[in-house]
């Protein structure tokens, strides 16, 4: 059974290492190593993760058989729940971990009297887009978000209505 547990501040280095492993493996082929390195340095370093925590994002581990196999982060934004990150180590995918996380997120969203969950997904992240579609998310728009130094995120915004 998958356990979900809040990431403690003292675990940020461990979180950064797992994030780097998963994100490097998954996104290098999609967005290229150079762009991915920039994004990792911006969002997945201990400093970047701490800043996101300070900005109100809640980070939780996904733990399977006492092994930290992934994590996710979310926060209320614009009257909806924003799922910022959901990453699972590739050797643990297909074990219903994402479904467990999604169920938790739905309950949390309801408990905060919100009726929608939204997220951003890279337009070329086909497998992830298919998973979110299977869960019931719909594409509501495309957007390009500059992140500095000539880099940008080319995403779809997906939304799920409870």
What is each residue range found by the language model?
Residues 128:
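Helix-turn-helix
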Residues 92, 96, 148:
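Glycine-rich phosphate-binding loop
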Residues 132, 137:
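Conserved active-site tyrosine of GNAT-family acetyltransferases
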Residues 99:
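Residues forming the Rossmann-fold NAD(P)(H) cofactor-binding site
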Residues 79, 118-122, 138-155:
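Conserved catalytic-core motifs of GNAT/GCN5-like acyltransferases
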Residues 109-120:
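Conserved GNAT acetyl-CoA-binding A-motif
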Residues 6-12, 16-91, 102-104, 108, ...:
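Acetyl-CoA-dependent GNAT
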Residues 1-4:
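Extreme N-terminal starter segment of soluble prokaryotic enzymes
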């Amino acid at each position: 059974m998958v356990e979900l547990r809040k990431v403690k501040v003292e675990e940020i280095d461990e979180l950064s290492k797992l994030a780097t492993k998963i994100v490097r493996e998954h996104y290098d082929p999609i967005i290229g190593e150079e762009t991915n390195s920039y994004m990792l340095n911006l969002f997945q370093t201990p400093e970047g993760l701490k800043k996101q925590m300070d900005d109100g994002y809640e980070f939780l581990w996904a733990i399977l058989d006492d092994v930290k196999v992934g994590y996710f982060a979310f926060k209320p934004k614009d009257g909806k729940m924003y799922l910022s990150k959901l990453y699972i180590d590739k050797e643990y995918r297909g074990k219903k971990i994402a479904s467990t996380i999604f169920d938790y997120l739905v309950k949390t969203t309801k408990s905060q009297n919100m009726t929608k969950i939204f997220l951003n997904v890279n337009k070329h992240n086909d497998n992830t887009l298919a998973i979110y579609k299977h869960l019931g998310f719909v594409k509501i728009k495309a957007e390009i978000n500059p992140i500095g130094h000539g880099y940008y995120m080319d995403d779809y915004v997906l939304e799920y209505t409870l």
